[in-house]
Amino acid sequence: MSPRPRLAVIPALLLVAVTAIWGWTFVVVKDAVVAFPVAAFLAYRFALAVALWTPFLRHLRWRSVLAGSWIGVFMGLAFIVQTVGLHVTLASDTGLITGLFVVLVPAIEWVVFRVRVPRATLIGVGLALLGLLLLVGALPRQLALGDLLVALSAFGFAVQIILVARFSRHHDPVSLTVGQTVSALAIFILAAATPMGGGFPVPSASVLVAIAITASLATALGLFVQVWAQRQLAATTSAIVLLTEPAWAMFFGVWLSGNPFPPIRIAGAALLFATPVFVTLAALRARRPKPAKAEEPEDADFAVAAS
């Protein structure tokens, strides 16, 4: 087997690790920011993440920064629209509808770029959606404005995943990460400055800790690893891995907070965890070179005549 398929496991594992960090930070900071304006928290978080990248400013490639800024626009708008939708719909509906990005990624890639998704990956998409449904525990009862807003945010996250997969192969990962962080920061600042945004209150000590954790691990490190990993992963495969975030949040919620969860939700989380493994193994098997056919021995009479 060639070394390339084996190396593809490393980006997948790193993306899993980042997704686990995102799930962990959700559990760690949710109580600290429950009464803090979301737009302001995101603005402070991304501002600190940008500050953490300042030692690398002299080495940035500005063409890659510009490309990353387009990614950040979709990511920033997706965050804001999701936040607005969350205020007018159920949290369970938000989690399920946001997870639709795992379907939107292959759909958009096929419609726009004519990218065909392998059958095993499509099966993985179905398994991931089933796992998410079991984890959330219910289908939306009826579509409302909030549900449509959350669906729009899922579209934004899907576009972000696709653009990262496409741009990361041709651009410097640090510059691409900085670009999307800065443009998302601009959107969060504008959102916080609106009458409904809540302004920029002074963070408490617990909120400052939450900002520091999410800025360093979930944003600066997390977005960089996502960009680097997606250079070698298909966009749909990446989406399946990223969909495990709510399962990681549940896992850390049980471990750190002792939150009780019914068996059906645990089964959903287990299915979400298993799906990326299934898709990755299927991809490795598809890339495995087929054994060469044994050469036919030369005819003895022909060999003698040719000598």
Kindly give the residue locations of the regions a language model identified.
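C-terminal transmembrane-helix exit sites in multi-pass transporters
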Residues: 52-60, 101-123, 247-267
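Specific transmembrane alpha-helical segments of multi-pass solute transporters/efflux pumps
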Residues: 21, 25-26, 53-98, 106, ...
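Hydrophobic/aromatic residues within transmembrane alpha-helices
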Residues: 32, 41, 85, 111-113, ...
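Transmembrane alpha-helical segments that form core, pore/gating elements
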Residues: 27, 49-53, 105-107, 111, ...
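Juxtamembrane helix-entry segments on the extracytoplasmic side of multipass membrane proteins
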Residues: 6-12, 34-39, 43, 60-66, ...
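C-terminal-most transmembrane helix of multi-pass membrane proteins
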Residues: 1-9, 46, 207-209, 215-220, ...
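Helix-helix packing/entry segments at the starts of transmembrane helices
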Residues: 43-44, 80, 94-101, 163-186, ...
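Hydrophobic transmembrane alpha-helices of multi-pass small-molecule transport proteins
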Residues: 53, 75, 117-137, 153-157, ...
